[in-house]
Swiss-Prot record:
GO molecular function: rRNA binding; structural constituent of ribosome
Function statement: Binds directly to 23S ribosomal RNA and is necessary for the in vitro assembly process of the 50S ribosomal subunit. It is not involved in the protein synthesizing functions of that subunit.
Lineage: Eukaryota, Viridiplantae, Chlorophyta, core chlorophytes, Chlorophyceae
Native species: Stigeoclonium helveticum
Classification via Pfam families: Ribosomal_L20 (PF00453)
Signal peptide: none
GO biological process: ribosomal large subunit assembly; translation
Name used for this protein in its record: Large ribosomal subunit protein bL20c
KW ATP-binding (keyword) present: no
GO cellular component: a single term: ribosome
UniProt main location, coarse: plastid
Domain of life: Eukaryota
UniProt keywords, alphabetically: Chloroplast, Plastid, Ribonucleoprotein, Ribosomal protein, RNA-binding, rRNA-binding
Subcellular locations according to the entry: Plastid, Chloroplast
Gene for this chain: rpl20
Amino acid sequence: MTRVKRGIVARKRRKKILNYTKGFRGAASKLFRTANQRYMKALKLSFVNRRKKKRDFRSLWISRLNAAVRKNGLNYNEFIFALKICNINLNRKTLSQISICDPQTFNLLYDTLKPLLIKHLNTK
């Protein structure tokens, strides 16, 4: 069987990883084994954090909504319940943007919901 020399292929593979880890600190950018471990961990963490980002933004929108609604005397869950009663299908991101960028519109929305919520609670 003929001998296969892997020098070029192996060097290319190592160089590719070392190029990726160029900005890493210490040995993680110089030594192949450490760089490879850091590269694998970086890929894993980027995968995890792409999902975590969605959770974090949703909780941020909810916090902003809660703060905006509490100014008017309700809390978050009562506000969302009132939206469901009135069949207003705005997501939390949109509501959060409205509360920050256009408070007059948000107050108008709140003023339309408040009587309906009180009416619904009194009927039960």
